[in-house]
From Swiss-Prot:
The species this protein was found in: Lactococcus lactis subsp. cremoris (strain MG1363)
Family according to the record: Belongs to the BMP lipoprotein family.
Residues carrying lipid (N-palmitoyl cysteine): 22
UniProt membrane topology term: Lipid-anchor
Protein name: ABC transporter nucleoside-binding protein BmpA
Domain of life of the native organism: Bacteria
Induction (UniProt): Expression is induced in the presence of purine via PurR.
Covalently attached lipid (S-diacylglycerol cysteine), positions: 22
Amino acid sequence: MKKRVIAVSAIALASVAVLAGCRSHDASGTSGKVKTDLKAAIVTDANGVNDRSFNQSAWEGLQSWGKENNLKKGTGYTYFQSNSASDYTTNYNSAEQQGYKLLFGIGFSLQDATSAAAKNNPKSNFVIVDSVIKDQKNVTSATFADNESAYLAGVAAAKATKTNKIGFIGGMQSDVITRFEKGYVAGAKSVKSDIKVDIQYAGSFSDAAKGKTIAAAMYGSGDDVVYQCAGGVGTGVFSEAKALNSSKNEADKVWVIGVDQDQEYLGKYKSKDGKDSNFVLVSTIKEVGTVVKDIADKTKDGKFPGGTIVTYNLKNGGVDLGLDNATSEIKDAVAKAKTDIIDGKITVPSK
């Protein structure tokens, strides 16, 4: 079966602004008449719904959808927490047994488990987020042009660095994280061709201690902007940046670039010279929550896009850059690069 690719409209992503302000972790639905009998759930990867990143965004999107349809958490919508890869199949089985018929696998590591669950449950609909499953009519593949938002982050990093050295910390090597890496490097070098980019992988998406160690080495070697694309590993990067910046005057701060959602709220600290400050330069935003809500709405209306790849990019608002603490110079450079990417003047590498 030939795979169809869908370009998502900006209208379909109009709920981005609403979701951006959503940070509730205890939504249980609202009063009123239930608007659908569709039961939807997400199966997380090992980082869980409080990862301040990818899974959290997905859960926020499902909560928003559930509340809009007057569903109750635990009966109309829910999440199944995976503590390791061995939980994926068990969680899919549990979701099926509890009557959930729209199931989202959050992250490329769930690809095999999602494919198998879809084959075993042909009357249910599945969505693999951040990966591609081919030739299964009851599976939608939701992918992101992460390289585009990462390119903008690279532009920002190159404009912000004082040392001409910046860093990139990936979780585990994969096609998805490679997109971030390649876009970031290309964006930085479009501003400064001689900039040095230190690239390291943690070999994990959950080892915060490893993230802290890598970040300490990067900052110690002169990297003054570090982009972390590593799930829970990023927690350690933020921890190291906060500790280091708290011992410095504000003018000497080092930066972190956030990922998947606007992570500016993680960058608050007090500098050595007593100033309340923030070390998150910008954040690459992946509207995972909007994807969940968008596809759930389509499914509710009988229009589940099964057997397709749904692509979210800069043009349709599926990815973007939160400008957080960017200067006006950085904002202008990012705006130009964004326009050029959307207009096709810049082709961002992904491999």
